[in-house]
């Protein structure tokens, strides 16, 4: 046949079935899908050679078609060369040896004689209709029926009947030892070829013999009857299946099977249809070795519950299983789910103690992404534990750690400092270290922070040093922001630079003082000689000592009456500041900032301390790093940040990032208002060019590109929002649900200030006001700069009050506020704002009502009226009873009903407002369950002032 040929045409040409051709092609390594598929000419030639050239088609029988499905003779057997075209005596010897080695064969059952095929075939000691011997028995099979079975239909295998084991037959003379006698061969029956029938258990010997496998757990013992009573042999015959030809026994050693003989999956002895739990038993198993088995090498039998494709259907060698075998990962996941902990009634993933790092303010969705879990399951678990949290809501650190411990995870909440360091490391950036070696470090000026109690003369001291007047520009005469200045002093004939940072002394500016202490090298503690040590003085000492900063004490106002510098030295001894006069190491200088007394001595003390105790060096050749000590929004210049360069040199045009703000340095201005092209270490400058206002105390650093600065700022902004949401979220448990659902008063505020530090201090001071649980204070927005229309619209939508600190509203914003009815309050001194907000919160408290008893009345008679209902005739036994007053009904000194109201009150025929003790009256209560002898107790609620 020239060109391509179809499988069924080749089968017709060779005189075999299409199924046999497909099986032979599969043995040769050719994958052919169906009988209508085509094969190449070389493949067809090899196929014809494997069948020994063309063979005549068998004649169709008149009464049966059994000969049509008879298997062909085997191609390869042990000891026979592949070129052999027909089996010889060596085949019989090999088969007898295999049978003699202990391969049991079932007892032959009578079957109708098939019509002999006209083609001659060698005689084989087998009978048509007899099942071939079992291939993989675990024990000698004994499954013969006690009675002769019913003869099967033509082309159908006989069904073995479960019951008593059949008696062994006597062997014929000349048979090999251990071999079973077979029926007399019938002439004309075609000999099946080994490996040609996909349903045959006898396969080519060149396939590797599978290793013995242990019986499958739970499988029936070998030789036992099939569960359910139905035998696989009763199933209808397969299309084209061999039924009339004899089947030789499987060559090779028997395989131990699990379940039934025929394979680990409990296959039949003939390897054909009817295998209950199919599957070839391991590597190199017979194709189609089971009704539902996998063709070819299966992996140890079918998985319990898995249904494989039917072998040999429509001429196919066997289909793949309907569902793929589960991988080890899927099985492991199922096992872990079985072992998963149950938290709050919800099954959650089970960890192995690994560490999960989460940022502060992370949500349950973030946690679920880390552990590959469903966020809804975590939400349900927390809800069942009494914690109501959404999947995207920020969760506190304790909740995350508790939930992680329940699932065997070690949750670590990363601190903001560590998270920021990791963020910078992801961009190959480091903060806080000088690059280069020791030879590149140069001496820098000391940074000095002036600290102390309010009104003790800190700003006046700086004014005297700078020969300026900053104090008069501060509202209320108190410093409300940080000022940074650099002055030049003459020390031993050498010009030296000193950077001064002025911090507020008011109690509301604790955060500012802490930032000033962290950014400084030396702290000057100003104490008034006539006032002594005050609370903010102690707080300043604590900040300086916590930052490990040396302290120089300036005893101010020594020119005033009542000044006692010795007393100050004695008081500060309690806090570890021992003067040099008393044998300590702290330098005390008595000064008068107003008169300018001993200012040079104070500067000299600062320089001596810096030279003796500190190593003030930095690398000016690296990219600049420092801290933003203050920031504000200027109307004409935009965001302006006062930065202190600590390392490197800051130049105009550098890309900088400070906290969640970024930008490019457009302009730098010093404390005198003059432009600066570059700022060396320890130099404070005002930087113009940020896209937003940086936070006071944020670290700034120079990066290579604007893109990197924007990415760092965006990530910091997202982290800041999450942390703020986690901090502001109020935890509501199920026990507190009733109280949480009750109506509560809340004062919403929008804060606007002239600089970031003032806004931060004002917010912390306002949030620290404690009035009562019934009222709450909420800051819904905060910002630096004037009050805009956007602020007014937000306040109108949220019923908020706008607080302006040293800022005013724009013209259109004022008109919009008047039109929308939004209240704007302006303040210039911080404690005035705190006092007024506290009074407003107290005014929002619900009033307290106190019950005052008025009198009691006894019901003597009852009268019914069609107009007003039931009328109670009463005698006032004590006090007075008023109309429209509250009342309760008592019966046998037990309260029957509360919160009644006296609708009408009559004395004889006149309506009266009240009736006093000893008089009779009639009254209606709007209540019908009244009895004679009941008492009516009248009272009223009087509002009580709340402190």
Curated annotation (Swiss-Prot):
One of its GO terms (cellular component) is cytosol. This is Translation initiation factor IF-2. One of the essential components for the initiation of protein synthesis. Protects formylmethionyl-tRNA from spontaneous hydrolysis and promotes its binding to the 30S ribosomal subunits. Also involved in the hydrolysis of GTP during the formation of the 70S ribosomal complex. It comes from Mycobacterium marinum (strain ATCC BAA-535 / M). Residues 255-318 have a biased composition (Gly residues). It comes from the Bacteria. One of its GO terms (molecular function) is translation initiation factor activity. Residues 131-145 have a biased composition (Low complexity).
């Amino acid at each position: 046949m020239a060109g391509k040929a179809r499988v069924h045409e080749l089968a017709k040409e060779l005189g075999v079935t299409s199924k046999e051709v497909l099986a032979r092609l599969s043995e040769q390594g050719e994958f052919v899908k169906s009988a209508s598929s085509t094969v190449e000419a070389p493949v067809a030639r090899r196929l014809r050679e494997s069948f020994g050239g063309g063979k005549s088609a068998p004649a169709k029988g008149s009464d049966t078609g059994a000969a049509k499905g008879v298997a062909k003779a085997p191609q390869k057997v042990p000891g026979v060369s592949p070129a052999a075209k027909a089996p010889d005596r060596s085949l019989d010897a090999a088969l007898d040896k295999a049978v003699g080695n202990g391969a049991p064969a079932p007892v032959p059952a009578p079957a109708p004689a098939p019509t002999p095929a006209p083609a001659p075939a060698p005689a084989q000691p087998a009978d048509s209709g007899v099942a071939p011997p079992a291939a993989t028995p675990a024990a000698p099979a004994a499954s013969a029926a006690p009675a002769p079975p019913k003869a099967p239909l033509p082309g159908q295998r006989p069904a073995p009947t479960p019951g008593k084991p059949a008696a062994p037959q006597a062997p014929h003379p000349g048979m090999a030892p251990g071999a079973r006698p077979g029926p007399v061969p019938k002439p004309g029956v075609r000999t099946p070829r080994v490996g040609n029938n996909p349903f045959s258990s006898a396969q080519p010997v060149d396939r590797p013999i599978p290793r013995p496998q242990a019986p499958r757990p739970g499988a029936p013992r070998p030789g036992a009857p099939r569960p359910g009573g139905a035998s696989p042999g009763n199933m209808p015959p397969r299309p084209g299946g061999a039924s009339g030809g004899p089947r030789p026994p499987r060559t090779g050693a028997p395989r131990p099977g699990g379940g039934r003989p025929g394979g680990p999956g409990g296959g039949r002895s003939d390897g054909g249809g009817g295998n209950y739990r199919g599957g070839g038993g391991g590597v190199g198993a017979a194709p189609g070795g089971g009704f539902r088995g996998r063709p070819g090498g299966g992996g140890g039998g079918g998985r319990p519950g898995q249904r494989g494709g039917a072998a040999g259907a429509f001429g196919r060698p066997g289909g793949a299983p309907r569902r793929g075998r589960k991988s080890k990962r899927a099985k492991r996941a199922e096992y872990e789910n079985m072992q998963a902990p149950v938290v709050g009634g919800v099954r959650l993933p089970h960890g192995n103690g690994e560490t999960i790092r989460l940022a502060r303010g992370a949500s349950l969705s973030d946690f679920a992404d880390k552990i590959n879990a469903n966020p809804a399951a975590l939400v349900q678990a927390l809800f069942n534990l009494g914690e109501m949290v959404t999947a995207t809501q920020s969760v506190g650190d304790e909740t995350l750690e508790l939930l992680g411990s329940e699932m065997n995870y070690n949750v670590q909440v990363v601190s903001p400092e560590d998270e920021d360091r990791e963020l910078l490391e992801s961009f190959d950036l480091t903060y806080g270290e000088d690059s280069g070696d020791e030879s590149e470090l140069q001496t820098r000026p000391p940074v000095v922070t002036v600290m102390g109690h309010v009104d003790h003369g800190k700003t006046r001291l700086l004014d005297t040093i700078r020969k300026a007047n900053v104090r008069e520009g501060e509202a209320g005469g108190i410093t409300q922001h940080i000022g940074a200045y650099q002055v030049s002093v003459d020390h031993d004939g050498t010009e030296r630079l000193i950077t001064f940072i002025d911090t507020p002394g008011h109690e509301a500016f604790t955060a500012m003082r802490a930032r000033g202490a962290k950014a400084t090298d030396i702290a000057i503690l100003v104490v008034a000689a006539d006032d002594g040590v005050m609370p903010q003085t102690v707080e300043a000492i604590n900040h300086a000592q916590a930052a490990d900063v040396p302290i120089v004490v300036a005893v101010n106002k020594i020119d005033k009456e009542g000044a006692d510098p010795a007393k100050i030295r004695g008081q500060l001894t309690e806090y570890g500041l021992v003067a040099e006069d008393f044998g300590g190491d702290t330098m005390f200088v008595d000064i008068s900032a107003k008169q300018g007394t001993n200012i040079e001595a104070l500067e000299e003390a600062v320089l001596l301390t810096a030279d003796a105790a500190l190593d003030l060096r930095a690398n000016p050749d690296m990219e600049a790093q420092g801290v933003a000590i203050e920031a504000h929004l200027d109307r004409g210049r935009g965001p302006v940040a006062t930065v202190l360069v600590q390392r490197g040199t800051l130049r105009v045009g550098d890309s900088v990032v400070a906290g969640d703000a970024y930008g490019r340095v457009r302009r730098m201005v010093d404390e005198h208002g003059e432009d600066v092209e570059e700022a060396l270490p320890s130099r404070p400058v005002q930087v113009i060019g940020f896209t937003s206002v940086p936070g006071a105390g944020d670290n700034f650093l120079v990066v290579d590109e604007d893109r990197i600065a924007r990415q760092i700022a965006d990530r910091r902004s997202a982290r800041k929002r999450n942390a703020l949401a986690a901090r502001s979220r109020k935890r509501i448990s199920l026990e507190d649900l009733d109280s949480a659902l009750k109506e509560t008063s809340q004062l919403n505020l929008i804060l606007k200030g002239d600089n970031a530090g003032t806004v931060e201090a004002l917010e912390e001071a306002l949030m620290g006001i404690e009035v009562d649980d019934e009222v709450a204070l909420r800051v819904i927005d905060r910002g630096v700069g004037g009050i805009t229309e956007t602020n007014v619209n937000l306040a109108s939508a949220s019923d908020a009050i706008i607080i302006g600190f040293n800022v005013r509203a724009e013209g259109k914003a004022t008109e919009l506020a008047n039109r929308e009815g939004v209240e704007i309050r302006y303040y210039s001194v911080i404690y005035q704002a705190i006092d007024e907000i506290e009074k407003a919160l107290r005014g929002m408290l619900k009033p307290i009502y106190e019950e005052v008893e008025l009198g009691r009345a006894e019901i003597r008679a009852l009268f019914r009226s069609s107009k007003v209902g039931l009328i109670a005739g009463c005698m006032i036994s004590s006090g007075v009873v008023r109309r429209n007053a509250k009342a309760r009904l008592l019966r046998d000194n037990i309260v029957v009903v509360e919160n009644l109201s006296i609708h009408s009150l009559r004395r004889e025929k006149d309506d009266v407002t009240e009736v006093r003790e000893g008089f009779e009256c009639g009254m209606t209560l709007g209540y019908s369950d009244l009895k004679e002898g009941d008492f009516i107790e009248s009272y009223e609620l009087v509002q009580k002032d709340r402190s």
